[in-house]
Amino acid sequence: MKRYVCSTFVACVMVLCVIPASGAAAHEAVAEDAGNRIAAPACVHFTADWRYTFVTNDCSIDYSVTVAYGDGTDVPCRSANPGDILTFPGYGTRGNEVLGAVLCATDGSALPVDRERAVR
């Protein structure tokens, strides 16, 4: 009985060690995909849950923002005046994640890469 319990425990530990390693590689790929967008400044905050993502502009100027998702979902840019709270889709129930709020150009396209401010 002790041998069975010990081998079961060892097998479980091995599985738990392999799963995070594969997840970390997937997360790095997601960060690279989002790296072509400029992160919103620190005064633009976001809160994400499964259904909605709220982006709040606590800055003193307007920003055009959108949300970067782990699976590359593209949502339209929206203008946020100071004090505005914008609502975007949440991360859902299928393993997606919200990477952060990102800035948009005035024409609604992604801004060019700035590696120091890119979403990571």
From Swiss-Prot:
Signal peptide (residue range): 1-32
The chain's disulfide connectivity reads 43-59, 77-104
- Which Pfam family, an example, fits this chain? A_amylase_inhib
UniProt keywords, alphabetically: Alpha-amylase inhibitor, Disulfide bond, Signal
> Per its UniProt record, what InterPro entries does this chain match?
A-amylase_inhib, A-amylase_inhib_sf
Q: Which Gene3D superfamilies match?
A: Alpha-amylase inhibitor
Molecular-function annotations in GO: alpha-amylase inhibitor activity
Q: Which SMART domains match?
A: A_amylase_inhib (SM00783)
Known role: Inhibits mammalian alpha-amylases specifically but has no action on plant and microbial alpha-amylases.
Q: What is this protein called?
A: Alpha-amylase inhibitor Haim-2
Q: Which organism is it from?
A: Streptomyces griseosporeus
